[in-house]
């Protein structure tokens, strides 16, 4: 279950399950039939409450024909099957109590290098464990950096 924050011009996604390594929370993105090349994925935690950031992340890509996300079985792992999503040190350094500063000045984006340039249509992010109780993200980017 995912919810988008309301009542504010700043929206976020909140997933009410922490997941586990055996049963992670998964988000699948469809970049369209002819996506631009990319080599990085960027995540911004929900800056009002960075403790709801995921601890671990797995990134996979696919070009399979999608009718429903659970139908894709040929995912290609990109990088480690268990990479650090956000570390306690990173989050503590950005938890200054004035989250608006991070939007206007510092732009806390955690970038994940995918290695080579790629243009796969689907990206699946698998997340598990959290520094608090849920997973919250303000924004997710796909970019060629």
Map each language-model feature to its residues.
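Aromatic, loop-rich ligand-recognition surfaces of beta-strand-rich domains
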Residues: 3-74, 105-145
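Extracellular carbohydrate recognition and processing domains
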Residues: 72-114
């Amino acid at each position: 279950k995912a919810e988008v924050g309301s009542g504010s011009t700043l929206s976020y996604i909140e997933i009410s399950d922490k997941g586990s390594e055996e049963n992670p929370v998964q988000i699948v993105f469809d970049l369209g039939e002819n996506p631009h090349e990319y080599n990085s994925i960027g995540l911004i935690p929900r800056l009002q409450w960075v403790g709801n950031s995921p601890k671990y992340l797995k990134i996979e890509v696919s070009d399979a024909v999608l009718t429903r996300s659970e139908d894709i079985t040929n995912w290609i792992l990109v990088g480690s099957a268990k990479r650090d999503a956000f570390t306690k040190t990173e989050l503590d350094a950005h938890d200054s109590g004035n989250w608006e500063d991070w939007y206007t000045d510092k732009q806390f984006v955690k970038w994940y290098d995918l290695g080579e340039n790629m243009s796969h249509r689907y990206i699946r992010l698998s997340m598990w464990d959290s520094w608090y109780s849920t997973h919250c993200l303000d924004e997710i980017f796909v970019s060629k950096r």
